[in-house]
From Swiss-Prot:
Residues 1-53, 158-318, 418-602 are extracellular. GO terms for biological process: plasma membrane fusion involved in cytogamy. The keyword rRNA-binding does not apply. The keyword Iron does not apply. Belongs to the PRM1 family. InterPro entries: PRM1. One of its GO terms (cellular component) is plasma membrane. It is a multi-pass membrane protein. This is Plasma membrane fusion protein prm1. It comes from the Eukaryota. It is found in: Cell membrane.
Length: 725
């Protein structure tokens, strides 16, 4: 389409000097006689190489990194102060913890002493019950053994005595009755004989009394009366009764034997009651640890070395970033300078396109001003055969790489690169955090070690007191058991050995040796062996051992809280209830790193959003190009391409109207502009452009004015005159 515009000055689009050739030939713009040009030459361009966008962006990245390093150093300084403060708190808490045995031991000592006293009381009760039980069992066993024989013995003895007493009584009664009967019979016979004899004597006395005198009479009545009263003495019965009464009864024997057997057991009970009734554990024998004071924060190499290392890392990183980015900013000037040289040369080469009538002037200006993006578009457009699509591809690339778009892209990339540098610095710092965690673990380990030492020392002293109690009780209570069982076992061994020797000497060479040995084993040997086993068991188990206190009585909980097997890290005695980390000191560092990480994340999101803006802008261009890419090209009647214009020679002032057609210049050997086929050639219409002379300072040059209608090409896909894209 053709548009008319009022006359206007084309200065400074074209230089006033040498702007026309009076001979009407091709224009050759000479240099100023002094070599000065209104545009920048090569040396001027090279003098501004250090102001290229990449150097500036790298310097901006360096500035952001330096700000981040300074912020990290400030945050780490605050973190160091907080960590030292937390360390002091931990130190105070650790001192309180290692002093806890001083307070806890008093209660534990009382608990231990009370436990020993209760155990001794229970031991006394158990011993009394055991002794009573053993006493009754032994009595039962002995009674079973001796009462059988005692019953038989008592029966035999008492039966014999009763039998003898009955015989004596019967004999006495018989003798007494027989003697009296005989005496009476004798008395009767003697009385009869005496009566007869006395009668005879009386007769004799009557005859011979005159001659011989009187013969005495026989009188034995008194003697016979003694015979009537003859009987066995009663002392015989009393003696037998005395013997009978002197034989003990079974109840008396049982009571006597029982008293004999109970005597040692009752004595043992008396000893046990006397030793254990009022037993009191010596509480003064249990130790009380002294208070402890820890000091591992003053001059602590752990925290100071960690933050010194972090400061060294940040300083080193700052130095590295300064060196690398400055070197990169300086080195980038080299390719940029070379780029400027090539761009200058390319501009000089492509500036000749202005004199050619085969190219669009705006395209030429774009190619000259943006050589690299234009070259990229040309290369991408070369994949298409249709000139319309080639132009659309070049337009998309030009749209996506316009100065505003490239500014947004470079800003986003610079922001992402800055975030990357900060991320590298953050990771370098985070790699040192385990060292601090390890050092803090050593703090906890120091507390636990101190607790373990205190607990072990206390346990050793307390266990020594308990061991002394064991020794005392075993000696005073069970010492006689060991001595007596050993003596009885030795006695039984001697008895068995002696008895076996006698049996072997007596029946060793006879056929009765085996039976006698079997009878001995059955009656005596097995019972003696069982008694020896029982005595051995009593000897081995008749002692007391109170359980000892473990060495980690006061340190087990603290040690478990920092062990690797702890299920909940917040159980650590260095952790507060609200902390998410294992202790307060590392939580300070993690808070700083989390803050820095959050800042990096925010900057990354901002840079990504800026990059997304560039992507959206590029997508807009792509979508616009695609809408034209697949649409039908309009004809001239539909508002498409303009009418063909014949070519016109140069006017009298030496200006040549440049046709806006895309006719390739096959005669040109320099082809910096794209070579793609365009529509059919059309002749351009030339119009004379009058201008007037005008003084320009002392040089005397004339300004050039253009009146009338400018020659512009209308296109179905690009209208350069309307700046439509």
């Amino acid at each position: 389409m053709l548009f008319s515009r009022p006359g206007r000055s084309i200065f400074p689009l074209l230089p006033p000097y040498g702007a026309h050739d009076p001979n009407g030939g091709r224009r050759i713009i000479p240099l100023n006689p002094d070599g000065i040009t209104p545009y920048l030459g090569l040396r001027s361009r090279l003098s501004q190489v250090w102001l290229n966008r990449w150097t500036i962006l790298l310097l901006l990245v360096l500035a952001r990194v330096l700000i981040a390093v300074a912020g990290m150093q400030s945050d780490m300084g605050s973190a160091k102060r907080e960590a030292l403060s937390a360390c002091t708190s931990v130190e105070s808490m650790g001192s309180a913890m290692v002093s806890m045995p001083h307070y806890l031991s008093q209660g534990v000592n009382e608990l231990t002493a009370a436990g020993v006293e209760k155990a001794v009381s229970a031991l006394k009760t158990m011993l009394l019950l055991t002794i009573t039980g053993v006493e009754e069992l032994i009595l039962f066993f002995i009674k079973v053994m001796y009462q059988t024989y005692l019953c038989l013995f008592t029966m035999v003895v008492r039966g014999s005595v009763h039998l003898a007493l009955g015989v004596v009584e019967d004999a006495a009664d018989f003798l007494n009755s027989t003697v009296k009967s005989i005496g009476q019979d004798i008395h009767k016979s003697v009385d009869s004989f005496e009566s007869s004899l006395n009668s005879f004597i009386d007769d004799i006395n009557g005859i011979a009394s005159a001659l011989l005198g009187e013969i005495p009479k026989l009188d034995i009545s008194d003697k016979l009366d003694k015979l009537d009263s003859l009987s066995l003495p009663s002392s015989i019965d009393s003696t037998i009764d005395k013997v009978n009464n002197s034989i003990p009864t079974f109840d008396e024997v049982d009571k006597y034997v029982t008293n004999i057997l109970r005597t040692p057991f009752e004595e043992v009970k008396r000893l046990v009651n006397g030793s254990l009734s009022n037993y009191t554990f010596d509480r003064s024998a249990l130790p009380v640890p002294a208070k402890e004071q820890l000091s591992f924060c003053d001059g602590s190499d752990g925290i100071n070395s960690f933050f010194d290392k972090v400061a060294h890392i940040t300083t080193t990183a700052r130095t590295i970033f300064i060196a690398v980015l400055i070197i990169a900013a300086v080195l980038v000037c080299v390719p940029v300078g070379w780029q400027e040289i090539r761009r200058w040369r390319t501009m000089k080469e492509r500036s000749q396109l202005v004199h050619k009538d085969a190219h669009d002037p705006m395209d030429v200006v774009y190619i000259v001003s943006r050589p690299y993006t234009a070259a990229t578009g040309v290369k991408a457009a070369s994949r298409f055969s249709n000139s319309r699509r080639q132009i659309l591809v070049r337009w998309v690339i030009a749209y996506a790489t316009s100065p505003p778009a490239l500014f947004v892209l470079c800003l986003a990339l610079a922001g992402l690169f800055s975030c990357l540098c900060q991320y590298i610095l953050l990771k370098a710092v985070e790699r040192t955090v385990p060292e601090l965690t390890s050092e803090v673990g050593q703090f906890a380990g120091k507390v636990v070690d101190k607790l373990q030492d205190t607990s072990a020392k206390w346990a050793a002293d307390a266990n020594s007191a308990i061991a002394d109690t064991n020794t005392d009780l075993n000696k005073n209570i069970f010492g006689w058991v060991n001595t007596s069982t050993t003596a009885v076992n030795d006695t039984l061994d001697a008895f068995v050995e002696k008895t076996t020797g006698v049996l072997n000497d007596t029946f060793g060479d006879t056929v009765l040796s085996g039976p006698v040995q079997e009878v001995y084993d059955c009656l005596i040997g097995l019972k003696v062996e069982a008694v020896q086993k029982a005595l051995t068991w009593v000897h081995d188990h008749a002692h007391i051992d109170f359980p000892l206190l473990p060495n980690d009585t006061f340190s087990r909980g603290a040690a478990d809280s920092i062990s690797d097997g702890s299920s909940n890290p917040s159980d650590s005695f260095l952790a507060d209830a609200d902390d998410q980390t294992s202790n307060k000191i590392t939580e300070v560092v993690f808070r700083v790193t989390d803050k820095i990480e959050e800042g990096i994340r925010t900057e990354t999101v901002i840079s990504a959003v800026i990059l997304l803006v560039w992507v959206v802008n590029a997508l807009i261009g792509v979508l616009r190009a695609l809408s034209l890419f697949w649409s039908r090209e309009r004809t001239r009647g539909e508002g498409g391409g303009g009418a063909p214009m014949p070519a016109a020679p140069a006017d009298s002032h030496g200006f040549v109207d440049v046709p806006l057609t895309a006719i390739p210049d096959v005669a040109s050997h320099s082809q910096p502009a794209p070579r793609y086929e365009g529509p059919a050639p059309a002749l351009a219409v030339s119009r004379d452009i009058p201008y007037g002379d005008e003084k320009l300072g002392s040089v005397g040059q004339k300004a050039l004015h253009v009146d009338g209608i400018s020659d512009l090409r209308g296109s179905s896909y690009v209208e350069y005159g309307m700046e439509k894209r």
